Amino acid sequence: MDSLLLYFADEQAPALRLAEALGLPAAAIERHRFPDDELRLRLPFGAGQAIPRQVLLYRSLDRPNDKLVELLLVAGEARALGVQRLLLVAPYLAYMRQDIAFNPGEVVSQTIVGAFIAQHFEGLVTVDPHLHRIERLQQAVPLGEAAIALSGAPM
């Protein structure tokens, strides 16, 4: 298998529509929350099963805090298993509003989250990101032309 789309159960319907449109197989990531709110994730690769060279991870980043940890864990395990190319499909991209420090000590989350994504993924596709004082998504997520912002406006 060359490419696979991975998704979480709460986003199954849109992820499967995307997989069908792209002609890709899709599989769910198992997610368990422990009483202390830690997460246990399991990628859908069985013992002896071929690992795809490329994985598209579908994860919208609304209510982002747990989901950013999920990205970190999934990307780390996918790399450990031998996945060579990780692409993030995030219809909503969180933490893009805070693009400047208005007061001393304020965290510029856009820069930090953008660097985090670029560190773990070779590409990003999102829709209408909050880019207030910058012109292009690539300024926030340093992936060059592999950081793609689509418009949700009707054509």
Please name every model-derived segment.
Residues M1-M155:
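PRPP-associated nucleotide enzymes
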